[in-house]
């Protein structure tokens, strides 16, 4: 039987908005591990696609690093993963799914700016100027994400990442002709840093027939 947690790499699920990625995860958990309690959806930042679904174990990570707040009943993504790793013998979680890559990136970006201000003592306003520029800001974001994913891999927990797709205009390097390519919503460098090491990349599409 396939052990999804034996691969130290994520599974990426790409599709257009409203495709049903979160529903897919809800159904997959029961199919793969027999019980909804074996999977955890981490809804990142402003993502809120889980509210209409039942039989789904979910926790919201509105920030990257934040201690539990009794008033809001929320904690940071790092604290969620800390809890998983420390107590998973009790929880029995087999797989974690991040919903979505772009909102995961957003909370990591906010944390990166906070770290930059703390380390440099400067009022860093954008990722492009973080640590003097030269792409150091985006590189730190990727490292933050990869570090947390690695913690889950090493704990034997399968990692899935949901992300959106869009059409991007490309130019053929030989002919110079422009064409559209269905691809991810992220910047190429950020996406490649995760996707190039993925165990599997699954792309869902919607086909519509309009009559009349």
Located regions from the model:
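Conserved P-loop
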Residues: 1-98, 102-107
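Phosphate-binding/switch region of NTP-binding enzymes
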Residues: 6, 159-212
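A solvent-exposed, charged loop/short amphipathic helix patch at secondary-structure junctions
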Residues: 106-140
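Short secondary-structure boundary/capping segments
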Residues: 57, 112-113, 175-178
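Well-ordered, non-membrane alpha-helical segments in soluble/globular domains
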Residues: 74-81, 134-146, 180-188
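Loop/turn-to-beta-strand initiation segments
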Residues: 92-95, 154-161
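Short acidic/His/Gly/Ser-rich catalytic and metal-binding motifs that mark active-site loops
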Residues: 50-51, 104-109, 113-116, 168-173
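Catalytic-core regions built around general acid/base machinery
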Residues: 144-156
